[in-house]
Amino acid sequence: MVCTDVLGRIEREVIKECSPTLAGLKTGNLFNYRYDNISDFRKELASVNRKLNAKGVYVTFLKRNEKSALLYVFRPDRLEKDLSQPAVQNVLKTFGYTDYKVGASIKHLKQRVGENTCFPHEIGLFLSYPVEDVIQFIRQKGCNYKCCGVWKVYCDEAFSQKMFARYRKCTEVYLRVFDLSLIHISEPTRRVVI
């Protein structure tokens, strides 16, 4: 049995790092999660998935070692829509993606994360980053951007700044509510107007 303090810790981390995804504002979020042992981590991951899957949110690891895992928290329905866009498929094709279904694309992303020394930049397409910004990030090698927030912005700065503010506000609200013990991952999702 996993200690409830540990489950509270993973829940708080998911809320802290992934509130925009939990609220339905983004397709996915990514964060590094540290744990003490792999057995407890597997139980924590299973517990969080049991609570979130009913709400249409899933958690998987893209890479892990003995003490930490790179977790991807995502909404498969939104990811499916994102992956169906021709512009997204064109970018993914250049990185060896051939099947644009959710499961196959995540599997290929895991392979790319695991085998590359440098982070696969197409990951932004799995995180609701605008495709134009992902393309320019790759072309510009991360330089010459207009502004930087959740991602480096090359195109629509006003839109991106607005989204960054919404994501920050969402995270603040979700953390405040969680810290007041008014909501936990296992409770029904409440839409927060941001």
Where are these regions (language model features)?
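Short, surface-exposed ligand-recognition loops at beta-strand->loop->(often short) alpha-helix junctions
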Residues: Y35-K43
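Single conserved hydrophobic/aromatic residue that forms the stacking wall/gate
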Residues: I183-I194
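Short, extreme N-terminal leader segments that mark the start of a protein/domain
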Residues: M1-Y33
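Internal catalytic-core helix/loop-beta-alpha segment
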Residues: T94-H121
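Short, flexible, solvent-exposed loop/turn segments with mixed acidic/basic and small polar residues
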Residues: C18-G24, V59-K63, K110-E115
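A glycine-rich, hydrophobic loop/mini-helix early in the fold
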Residues: E44-K101
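Hydrophobic/aromatic-rich, well-ordered segments within soluble, folded domains that form packed cores
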Residues: P120-C147
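Short terminal or interdomain "cap/linker" segment that borders an active site or interface and mediates
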Residues: Y145-I183
